[in-house]
């Protein structure tokens, strides 16, 4: 896959040609596989207190899926296949503060639904030529950077069968929020203290006050946009529902299954509304 380098004065005109190769069918195949192994994906740490039989058993009461001796990922995949016909290839956009929980859940959903997976921030970075060039563009021309975020969403929203981890730029303008309406938007609501601790390697270290303050400011700036999502998935609510005392016990399978159940509710409501609007 060819990645074009970017100049320091990258503009929207220069950005679009760099973006399109990343969204070609060949690039989509390259970027999206393999997503996950067949083993259970832990959200936070291999030391998390996991009770998979209990959590999945609790959820099986409402899904109708037998989870005895089942691989948790297989349970998610079966649920995904159950709702896929009603989903009709609609793309799924995950919003919320970027963290490994959101990323892992997005990849699991893509695998379960047999969708392509994209991270919109990564696409912008790759199209710009790397983190340094992307940051230089943002600092030199904030408007051009925002336009690049919109262009990414415009391209992605025109496609189907995608799971997209969207950056905060996706919820900070009315135009971008409108583009999310081309699919189903899901807010992955993770407590800031967990997000601040970072990925697995640094999860047990305490975040710096400066980092926490930065995340809090970003969260407050984007919160109203998050709240417009079709579905809100709270890590704390899932832990409470599954009777976990520690948020670390929640897995990506738990979150993905909850998302699929909420999507199923949305498709049922939509179907009922369509049937009610038909003339006698």
Curated annotation (Swiss-Prot):
<dbReference type="InterPro" id="IPR027417">
    <property type="entry name" value="P-loop_NTPase"/>
</dbReference>
<comment type="function">
    <text>Required for chloroplast biogenesis.</text>
</comment>
<keyword id="KW-0809">Transit peptide</keyword>
<dbReference type="GO" id="GO:0010027">
    <property type="term" value="P:thylakoid membrane organization"/>
</dbReference>
<protein>
    <recommendedName>
        <fullName>Probable inactive shikimate kinase like 1, chloroplastic</fullName>
    </recommendedName>
</protein>
<dbReference type="GO" id="GO:0009570">
    <property type="term" value="C:chloroplast stroma"/>
</dbReference>
<feature type="transit peptide" description="Chloroplast">
    <location>
        <begin position="1"/>
        <end position="54"/>
    </location>
</feature>
<dbReference type="GO" id="GO:0005829">
    <property type="term" value="C:cytosol"/>
</dbReference>
<dbReference type="Pfam" id="PF01202">
    <property type="entry name" value="SKI"/>
</dbReference>
<dbReference type="InterPro" id="IPR000623">
    <property type="entry name" value="Shikimate_kinase/TSH1"/>
</dbReference>
<keyword id="KW-0150">Chloroplast</keyword>
<dbReference type="GO" id="GO:0009507">
    <property type="term" value="C:chloroplast"/>
</dbReference>
<comment type="similarity">
    <text>Belongs to the shikimate kinase family.</text>
</comment>
<dbReference type="InterPro" id="IPR031322">
    <property type="entry name" value="Shikimate/glucono_kinase"/>
</dbReference>
<keyword id="KW-0934">Plastid</keyword>
<dbReference type="GO" id="GO:0009658">
    <property type="term" value="P:chloroplast organization"/>
</dbReference>
